[in-house]
């Protein structure tokens, strides 16, 4: 006990020393060229072009032929989802995909929002841009950039968009009405992949900042989870004067002295400001540690040799579906590992899930999306300058209880000193906008209300 108190005292002093040194820094904006070859002498075409998702008989026939030739290994008895995606349930997915799923219909769903492309730093950047159908008299819409992660895509936001752009017609107050921009990270979906090494979250942040300027927004709001959280954080570090507010549902806070308090155990947690809810979500330590180990194997592969596994996944739609949908199971709720079907249809429809898979399959971007891990983590954890820079823009955070790792308010506030809103969400996991659009929309609106009171 006395040893624990001594360790807590020493760690408390270290935390105080780090916090007292706090100073505002920003990242260097810089520039880049990620297209093939050298940057041309001519100025880049800055036009914004309408884009439409399309398909063809050839694309669908090729998919069906590949699906029909699938080979599955029988699962172990009573293994459920503990060994990964259960191939007995995968048979149901395959049958639905081949015989019921209507990709042409889903293409129409994708096209219900306006799509565009524009060239930035040599890459064709895809985004959807949804404006409010109506605005209260004398009001303007708040520009909100929403950024996805892996293995997600812009489609994750389709259910939350109307709650933000047209709240009155969805049972919400029109006090906050948004104009929503959802880009695809370069190398994901319809955004062109980099031809050069080194395209990381800071490069993506700079490109999305240029996108917002090109759309005419000098000031804007940001929202993100997974990689989107890091990209939005980097935008706030690059151009804080342009970011009016930052809302996150994931916080990457590894280079944060407060995270060390996690290792002191549950009994001393209260000394460092952990609430009862924090303690429930973080402990027992062994359970959280093993969850992180179980759920991070993919990260090691993608941070080291993404192209190898990418070759397999880009050649097999069934393999791609198993690889991605397993994340939609356990990252939504780790207890879904105990279910024969991984609990996938408890939160999502098969049409929704297969649409995500098709956006990776038809664009052939699984390999380039995985490279984003190597570019960001390949030099080692805590090796990037942005990890040591705090974010000095107003921030809101939604802590969903089934997120892979819970981030207590103390952890978040150390990285984001201007945290003005921290919410323990009632339910939900990693894919917040996709799984719980109403809850996430409510928290974004709550954050905006607090922000405007300042």
From Swiss-Prot:
Could you list the residue ranges that cross the membrane?
1-21
UniProt-listed PANTHER family: EPOXIDE HYDROLASE 1, EPOXIDE HYDROLASE 1-RELATED
Which cellular compartments is it found in? Microsome membrane; Endoplasmic reticulum membrane
Please report the record's description of how this protein sits within the membrane.
Single-pass type III membrane protein
* Regulation of protein activity: Inhibited by 10-hydroxystearamide and methoxy-arachidonyl fluorophosphate.
Q: What does this protein do?
A: Biotransformation enzyme that catalyzes the hydrolysis of arene and aliphatic epoxides to less reactive and more water soluble dihydrodiols by the trans addition of water. May play a role in the metabolism of endogenous lipids such as epoxide-containing fatty acids. Metabolizes the abundant endocannabinoid 2-arachidonoylglycerol (2-AG) to free arachidonic acid (AA) and glycerol. Binds 20(S)-hydroxycholesterol (20(S)-OHC).
Species of origin reads Sus scrofa
Record GO cellular component, one term? endoplasmic reticulum membrane
- Catalysed reactions, semicolon-separated: cis-stilbene oxide + H2O = (1R,2R)-hydrobenzoin; 1-(4-methoxyphenyl)-N-methyl-N-[(3-methyloxetan-3-yl)methyl]methanamine + H2O = 2-{[(4-methoxybenzyl)(methyl)amino]methyl}-2-methylpropane-1,3-diol; 8,9-epoxy-(5Z,11Z,14Z)-eicosatrienoate + H2O = 8,9-dihydroxy-(5Z,11Z,14Z)-eicosatrienoate; 11,12-epoxy-(5Z,8Z,14Z)-eicosatrienoate + H2O = 11,12-dihydroxy-(5Z,8Z,14Z)-eicosatrienoate
Question: What family is reported?
Answer: Belongs to the peptidase S33 family.
What's the domain of life for this entry? Eukaryota
Entry keyword set: Aromatic hydrocarbons catabolism, Detoxification, Endoplasmic reticulum, Hydrolase, Lipid metabolism, Membrane, Methylation, Microsome, Transmembrane, Transmembrane helix
Q: Which residues lie on this side of the membrane: Cytoplasmic?
A: 22-454
GO terms for biological process, alphabetical: arachidonate metabolic process; catabolic process; epoxide metabolic process; response to toxic substance
**What protein am I looking at?**
Epoxide hydrolase 1
Q: Which GO terms describe its molecular function?
A: cis-stilbene-oxide hydrolase activity; epoxide hydrolase activity; oxysterol binding
């Amino acid at each position: 006990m006395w040893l624990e108190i001594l360790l807590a005292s020493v760690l408390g002093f270290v935390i105080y020393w780090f916090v007292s040194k706090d100073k505002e820094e920003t990242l260097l904006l810089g520039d880049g060229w990620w297209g093939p070859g050298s940057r041309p002498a001519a100025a880049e075409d800055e036009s914004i072009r309408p884009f439409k998702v399309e398909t063809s008989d050839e694309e669908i026939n090729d998919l069906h032929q590949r699906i029909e030739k699938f080979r599955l290994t029988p699962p172990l008895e009573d293994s459920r989802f503990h060994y990964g995606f259960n191939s007995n349930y995968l048979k149901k997915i395959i049958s639905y995909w081949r015989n019921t799923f209507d990709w042409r219909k889903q293409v129409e769903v994708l096209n219900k929002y306006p799509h565009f492309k524009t060239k930035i730093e040599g890459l064709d950047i895809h985004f959807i841009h949804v404006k409010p159908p109506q605005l209260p008299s004398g009001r303007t819409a708040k520009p909100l950039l929403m950024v996805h992660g892996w293995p997600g895509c812009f489609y994750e936001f389709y259910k939350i968009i109307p709650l933000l752009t047209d709240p009155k017609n969805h049972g919400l107050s029109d006090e906050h009405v948004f104009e929503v921009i959802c880009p695809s990270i370069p190398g994901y979906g319809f955004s062109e992949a980099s031809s050069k090494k080194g395209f990381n979250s800071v490069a993506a942040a700079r490109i999305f900042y240029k996108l917002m300027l090109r759309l005419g927004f000098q000031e804007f709001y940001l929202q993100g989870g997974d990689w989107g959280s890091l990209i939005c954080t980097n935008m706030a570090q690059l151009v804080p004067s342009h970011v009016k507010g930052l809302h996150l549902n994931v916080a990457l806070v590894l280079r944060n002295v407060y995270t060390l308090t996690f290792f002191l155990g549950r009994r001393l947690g209260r000394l460092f400001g952990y609430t009862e809810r924090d303690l429930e979500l973080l402990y027992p330590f062994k359970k959280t540690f093993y969850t992180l180990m179980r759920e991070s194997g993919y990260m090691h592969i993608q941070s080291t040799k993404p192209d190898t596994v990418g070759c397999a996944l880009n050649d097999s739609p069934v393999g791609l579906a198993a690889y991605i949908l397993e994340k939609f199971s356990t990252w939504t709720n780790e207890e879904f590992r105990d279910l024969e079907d991984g609990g996938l249809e408890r939160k999502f429809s098969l049409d929704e899930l297969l649409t995500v898979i098709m956006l990776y399959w038809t664009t052939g971007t699984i390999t380039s999306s995985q490279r984003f891990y190597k570019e960001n983590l390949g030099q080692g954890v805590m090796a990037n300058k942005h990890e040591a820079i705090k974010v000095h823009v107003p921030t809101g955070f939604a802590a969903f209880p089934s997120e892979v790792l819970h981030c207590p308010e103390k952890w978040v506030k150390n990285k984001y000193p201007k945290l003005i809103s921290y919410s323990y969400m009632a339910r939900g996991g990693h894919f917040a906008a996709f799984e719980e659009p109403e809850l996430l929309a409510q928290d974004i609106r709550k954050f905006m209300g607090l922000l405007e009171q300042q």
